[in-house]
Amino acid sequence: MLARKLGISADYLETGSEIRDTDERELQIADAELELRLAEITDEAEAKLKRLRADALEAGDTVAASRANIALGLAAAHGGRNSEAIELLESGLELSPVSASARPDVYATLGKAYAASGRPKRAVELFESCLAEVSQEAPDDFAAQVRFTTYLSYALTDLGDLRRAEEVLEEALGKAEEMTDAYSRVRLYWGVARLNDIGGRPAAALDYIRRAIALLDVTDDTLHLARAHILSAAILLTQDRPEEATRHHNLAEKLLGSNAEPEDLSGLYADQSKAAARLGNVALALAKAEAAVAALAGDEYPREMGLGQWALAEARALDGNTDGADSAFREASMLLEAHGHRREYVDVYRSWGKFLRRAGREEEALEVLERATDLAAEQVADAQAHQAE
């Protein structure tokens, strides 16, 4: 009654504050989240979120603690700390679950961290669950379904199940007329381009990535436009068109800026190294390959590290550093066979075998090339089995 007469809230009369502790905490978390997005160095914002998380847990405010954990997890993923990101995001979702429809970015980041850490099966399970959830909760939200269909196709491709990846994308393409927003089409075209590239169909891959780039050109989404140029360049390199690939690399580098994610930078540098090597620029090939490896910290991105080591091996071979090239080829083949796509590790074994043959190490070359042949034969057998089904 007194609060009403004075024109103030009961909380203010009791505490001297216009908002409750939970609201104040939520406001501070929102401020720290914004700082994370805008700041180049995020240490201070992360420290603030950790303090707020501790306060929230002490107060029994699980919603705020969850939000702080999720924000910290997203920051860890952006910094390439995938193991930490997985732990934080899983903990945040356990404290206070949020739906895939409400926070698709959280589930996308978690799945991406699983895949980057060499756990594609877990990523597939997550995205299958997300797709089922959004299909049930919002059957008319085709954009959300396309988002998680595309993520699922990525995870299936990483797992090596190209047939099922193709099936889920074909189903989405069949509903393409229902899409009204550009981003749904971009995601879908991107997924089809990536699948065709990995499946050894570069012409079809280029067709779809060009469609994605055309749509992204009319948006302000520079990050995804940069990634589209990187994928386009990678496809062009498979067709031995390094000059055209370099033009896409230059555009991507400008669009990424200085605050890019480690895997984006490493992938760009590795492909720039390969393009430079094919154009005979040894110094640039070495510099870019070394940058590709240096962009990744620890063992957070095993596949990307394998691709970086492969680029470094090619550059060292071109430079005449036989021992250094052999060491990098060995590391690349080990990482890519464990974490890469089959076409990648077949190709790295072939490249390594050709290098050993040029170096006069015929016995070692024969062993490596036999390994490449065996892996390629498995790939053909799998493809024939899928066709028979």
List each language-model region with its residue ranges.
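Eukaryotic tandem repeat interaction scaffolds
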Residues: 209, 215-338
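C-terminal non-catalytic interaction modules
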Residues: 3-6, 301-308, 318, 322-389
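Mid-protein regulatory/catalytic core that forms ligand/cofactor-binding pockets
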Residues: 47-167
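Amphipathic alpha-helical segments of tetratricopeptide repeats
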Residues: 50-57, 90-95, 128-138, 170-181, ...
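Tandem amphipathic alpha-helical repeat scaffolds
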Residues: 27-41, 66-80, 102-119, 144-160, ...
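Short coil/turn linker motifs that delimit alpha-helical repeat modules in TPR/alpha-solenoid proteins
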Residues: 41, 60-61, 98-101, 119, ...
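Helix-turn-helix repeat elements of alpha-solenoid scaffolds
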Residues: 37-51, 77-91, 118-130, 161-171, ...
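DNA major-groove recognition helix of helix-turn-helix/homeodomain DNA-binding modules
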Residues: 1-12, 18
